[in-house]
Amino acid sequence: MKIKEIKKVTLQPFTKWTGGKRQLLPVIRELIPKTYNRYFEPFVGGGALFFDLAPKDAVINDFNAELINCYQQIKDNPQELIEILKVHQEYNSKEYYLDLRSADRDERIDMMSEVQRAARILYMLRVNFNGLYRVNSKNQFNVPYGRYKNPKIVDEELISAISVYINNNQLEIKVGDFEKAIVDVRTGDFVYFDPPYIPLSETSAFTSYTHEGFSFADQVRLRDAFKRLSDTGAYVMLSNSSSALVEELYKDFNIHYVEATRTNGAKSSSRGKISEIIVTNYEK
């Protein structure tokens, strides 16, 4: 594939990811500071805003190691990743999916290379129920096979374009707790937090994007980090659910109410229009 062909590809998420921000991009764009220095996204997820902005100098992070490995392999081994995904596409079936899914139960996953692990996750997210990433308490992937007639498992042009973009810019890829991702934030930098949301009801479970979860204590710790970054002179933006708890946590900052469309969730009732909050430490 020629570089000039790659440049025509619009950068966008390479995988489905729960809580993705594609539907909210028009609103978020209106709230972004006009100019900023370095870009930080400590909960990058599928990277909808990251790819939309395509910053030249950025730090991206997530606490999901399997997801971050996908970013790393797209950067380092795009062609090998594409070839493995082509094999998954050729053999795609419910039986094939369930066999590959069980690799984290019978220790086969420990024998896989990093690029094989990335291809496994990307394949499963493309063909499973609603594109969910969900693991049980043993950190075993447990989402059933989806019912797609002709899923696009390999997007060769997009993977190649993302690889070129990451390699041609000053982009640092991290994995771990959000606080580790913001240690280098300085005055004039822009930080976007998109954490697992505070549930709107007692029956809403905290996310299982990783088997550790994200507690209310973590939400408070995040609010404290938001305040510290604000005090350093950084531009800070955060997304969360439209709830009284979020309003209370961020009462000292600017709160914007928006409507988002959710397209993936374990229950059909969790999809559709929902209210969200975007918090900024600056006026727009």
From Swiss-Prot:
Q: Give the record's GO biological process terms.
A: DNA restriction-modification system; methylation; mismatch repair
Q: Which UniProt keywords apply?
A: DNA-binding, Methyltransferase, Restriction system, S-adenosyl-L-methionine, Transferase
> Has keyword Metal-binding?
no
- Residues binding S-adenosyl-L-methionine are W17, K21, G46, D62, D177, F178, D194
The family annotation for this protein states: Belongs to the N(4)/N(6)-methyltransferase family.
Reproduce the miscellaneous comment text. Answer: The DpnII restriction system has two different methylases.
Complexes and interactors: Monomer. Homodimer.
Q: What is the lineage of its organism?
A: Bacteria, Bacillati, Bacillota, Bacilli, Lactobacillales
The highest taxon in the source lineage is Bacteria
User: What Gene Ontology terms describe what this protein does at the molecular function level?
Assistant: S-adenosyl-L-methionine binding; sequence-specific DNA binding; site-specific DNA-methyltransferase (adenine-specific) activity
Q: What is this protein called?
A: Type II methyltransferase M1.DpnII
Q: E.C. number, please? A: 2.1.1.72
Q: Which Pfam families match?
A: MethyltransfD12 (PF02086)
Could you tell me which cysteines form disulfide bridges?
none
Instruction: Name the chemical reaction catalysed here.
Output: a 2'-deoxyadenosine in DNA + S-adenosyl-L-methionine = an N(6)-methyl-2'-deoxyadenosine in DNA + S-adenosyl-L-homocysteine + H(+)
Q: Which organism is it from?
A: Streptococcus pneumoniae
